[in-house]
């Protein structure tokens, strides 16, 4: 309950002072009892050497236990009394400080008599401009009234802040006292704590468990309270561990399965929305709990993994433990060791389940076996969940880049998850049967993409501030990705619907290496040609030129990855032009950027030609869309402050996940703000929508696409006053570079 202005203004703390004095006396008495128990009771008893002989009950042992228990109770009583006294003292001191803060503020504000504050905390002016009839209608009257109102809002806002602080102090103290007093009517609370914050956390954890025990019988208001508790404490290690261990591993799974989000029919309206929030907050809370290496949490982890292969409650129409746990793993950051153990168990289970030719779809969605019942009827083994646990697991890897890099560094894991034609033992990804929370689309390949992004960039997917850490392990995983997804025989990007955006962002993160590697297609010595300096790349990180060429072609084929890579290439080219400003290398960087754009656009045009007939409305529409990739903005994040983190520009794409591109720093110096502005200006100028234009030929596509691609160098030439024949010569060279790029990815001229 919120504390009112009048309550704080007139707060009398004398009763609280008396309570503190009384509890201090209790502490003294409990200390005397606790101190005297050992020397006056336990030690004399032990020294007496009393033993029991004969066949009767061991009276001596029973007495010894009672003496020991009494000592434990005395110790618990002292601990509880100290905790209560400390909580009361902290609360009294905080309330006194906030009351003084209020009185001082009111006195300062009311000085001069112009401002009046009522017992309800309402602020008025004693001589308000608004009440003066002579001023009404005069010039500036409206502005004066508005200024008064702003001052009133400011004062009332400060008072509300003070009252909010007091309410939080009161609530925290109440929760701490409830926890410290405990519910045991026959003993003392041995876990009592004098820390108000810690006691409140423990009370909240107990309350969350109490609500969870109601399961699906929780009302919407109780479910809202449960969600709020988890949201408040989801990053609190102690709360999370206490909640998880008191629920137990299997208990956690049974609770979430029983809440009914995936029931058929599915919940609707407010209940569905609340349950989706529960899934997110519970997953995040459990993720924090797994970071603990205590024995209790290790038992929890072992229980969850052990329950993974089996249907809950031995009911074959219920989901398997892996399905339930992985559903929660879509949110939160899980411990690396737990993810490794969980993933090994999940893959082992899947391989065992499919070794005789059964499919994962049947395993996770269930199936009906006709005519196999005892009465000759069908056996229905379907379950309402129908979710693929590997999808949730992949999202969990995506949120922990160390774990994802380790997972995909294992070739067996890589092959199993990625698959591809000719790859033995690869996983056959099933579609979710009931993806109520994802617009009816399978989440498997989308989640796989998130895990791969994390593994190759060294940054958690969805991080508030994406970073770029391309160490040896991350680069090795990216090399495998390029080889597998660039293989034209496998056509993985076409087959794995939902992964193309992740592939585009991964390509963007290695845009410097891709530029450098493709420059070596002519087998020339790239170092002698100065390509390292041109791109800010290192020869030691070079990808095989043909691998880079094939990967860029596959990225260019897809509309989504083509758009992301086009944005990334333009931003990267602009950064390299800026890095070489005032030298001939600036134009060389621009020409190479046009070459890369030409390669991407040729691949996209060919794919459109394969899918649509030239001249058809759909053909024209696809050309227009691909020629009109948009960009919302860019921010520059400078690496170097954190060991191993590279300088990178974070590209903020509209209605999509941001992506990062590498920017080389000269001698460790920070990227200049001007570089970020230059990239941002180039991207904003390319923000256009050509879908309304009649692009009905490949020439029209080339014209529009080239116009976007050259924005950075056009800005550069404008700022340097390059005009006339010199400008014409530069433009001719840029067009020629774009054409050369087209030849890099030209395969069958499906244009």
Which ranges hold each PLM region?
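Short hydrophobic membrane-inserting alpha-helices and related fusion/pore-forming segments
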Residues: 57, 638-663
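Intrinsic-disorder/low-complexity coil detector
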Residues: 21, 38, 43, 132, ...
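Alpha-helical rod/repeat scaffolding segments in eukaryotic adaptors/tethers
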Residues: 56, 60-63, 67, 74, ...
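N-terminal secretion-targeting helices of virulence/extracellular proteins
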Residues: 1-182, 744-751
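Compositionally biased amphipathic helical and low-complexity segments enriched in hydrophobic
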Residues: 12-14, 535, 653, 661
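Non-catalytic all-alpha helical scaffold/repeat segments
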Residues: 183-646, 665-672, 676, 690-740
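Gly/Ala-rich hydrophobic membrane-inserting helices
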Residues: 652-682
